[in-house]
Regions:
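Residue-level recognition of single "structural anchor" positions
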Residues: 1-284
Length: 284
């Protein structure tokens, strides 16, 4: 899931059906949502600035772009969470492409123009308690999202044109965007392994999030502490076996309502209105 292999590539290597790999990835995504939340529930107060940005990708086709809104700790690089926002296709288009976009919007509906504002507000509510020192670029939806969230926020803005060096206040979230692009086959430029549903993209991102926070060193060269260690949640790195050693249940871990939509697979793709949900009786 995090090695930049598509489901079919992984299936060929393992000698199984690609649907088997897909089902296991879905289950792993649900587990990682709960695993992350179990540690987040133990954080008392937010004690570091948080950098927030929107990672742009798409679902089903390039006519349906999506923002994965992510929040990263400025000092620890701990990934606190994510939400998603449907977007309207923008940028330069031919007349035929504009006509195609218009047809799709008449048929399936048009994305909410305030989707980023609403989902950034949801993301802010997912953060631990306390005053939020928020760092973002100059996107106009962010100040509105701050007001909508009802959190106490100190908001500072950095130009998206500033050099993306370690001195940039948004460096932690820019680095996370880079790692997502680097480690995920569904987000590569001009890929044919793109996510058909953003629900699947969210599940893969949940796995990548746990890997980044609990298994990966802050620095690959130094092989030092993980973000979770820097945040004080753990004293050592975890292994894959330790992450998977016990089954986790949503009835025993307080998963926020916004994240429950990912857990139960309720994130709907307009072009696939009957996408599979997670409603197995024995799963609870």
């Amino acid at each position: 899931v995090i090695s930049c292999s598509s489901y079919r590539q992984a299936a060929r290597q393992l000698g199984v059906s690609h649907t088997t790999v897909m089902r296991m990835a879905e289950r792993l995504g649900r587990h990682c949502l709960l695993f992350q939340q179990r540690y987040l529930n133990g954080i008392g107060q937010l004690e570091e600035p948080v950098a927030v940005d929107g990672f742009e990708t798409f679902e089903f086709s390039q006519y349906t772009p999506v923002h994965l809104n992510v929040a990263v700790g400025a000092r620890t690089h701990f990934v606190y969470g994510f939400t998603d926002s449907e977007l309207r296709r923008k940028g330069r288009m031919t007349q035929a492409q504009r006509a195609r976009r218009a047809f799709l919007e008449r048929t399936f509906g048009r994305p909410d123009p305030r989707a980023i504002e609403k989902e950034i507000a949801e993301l802010l509510r997912l953060l631990p308690d306390g005053r939020v020192e928020l760092r973002t670029d100059e996107h106009l939806a962010y100040p509105r999202a701050v007001r909508r969230s009802a959190r106490i926020v100190r908001h500072t803005v950095t130009s998206s044109k500033s050099a993306r060096t370690p001195r940039n206040p948004l460096f932690p979230v820019n680095l996370w965007d880079l790692l997502i692009r680097h480690s995920s086959s569904n987000h590569k430029r001009e890929t044919i392994a793109f996510s058909k549903r953003r629900q699947n993209a969210a599940e893969k991102l949940a796995v990548l999030q746990v890997w980044r926070n609990f298994l990966k060193s802050f620095s690959e060269k130094k092989q030092d502490a993980t973000p979770a260690m820097r945040l004080g949640l753990l004293e050592r790195k975890l292994s894959v076996d330790e992450v998977l050693q016990a089954r986790l249940f949503i009835t025993r871990i307080g998963l926020p309502v916004r994240l429950q939509r990912y857990y139960f697979r309720e994130t709907v793709t307009r072009r696939i209105p009957n996408g599979r949900t997670h409603d197995c009786t024995l799963a609870f």
